[in-house]
Amino acid sequence: MILLPGQTTDSATSLALKEWSGVVEGLLAGESRVLLRKGGIAEKGFACPGGPFWLFPTWSHQQEQGLNNRGARFIRPCPLADTVRIAGWATMEATWTMLDPALLPPLEPWHLLTRASVEKRFQYRHPALTVLLLRPYLLEQPVTLPADPAWDGCHSWLHLQAPLPLQPAHFVGPDCGGLRKALEGILGPSDKIKPPGA
């Protein structure tokens, strides 16, 4: 999918990241700030925007690949397929490209995936993962959108039909300065964030 420029401002964006619904719920509840990602089937890798993006919940493969004990309590039944509920957005504080599987266990306190699902994701196509440190924001009023067939498929990023306002919303959880230092202690210096399509 081609990600179009010019659809994000300081107050609104149409860019959205697809993620398992249980992980999205955990992020917006303050349970986690870390995602472990791989690009979709048609993507060369995982690109990272510098600006805000919506957290777009999906249910594909969630039950099969699994969330850990902290994440499992956020799993909800799949809603009607003709709507999507958007409850929050995020920015990326830092990203890391991880090539060493020995670094997976030290990350377990900060993400919501089972060890088996992380290892499967790491080994898919080529051994690597992108580690994301997010700053999530919860909308005061969630937005329900009609589903769009263009959102289907195995890709990480999509655009909503139109930009949605980012406010009113509030930051979820404590500041991530300490967590970033902890992750840098495991993974080293963070990567330079690049936009999708770069």
Mark where each language-model region is:
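Structured alpha/beta reader/binder surfaces that contact nucleic acids or chromatin modification marks
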Residues: 2-198
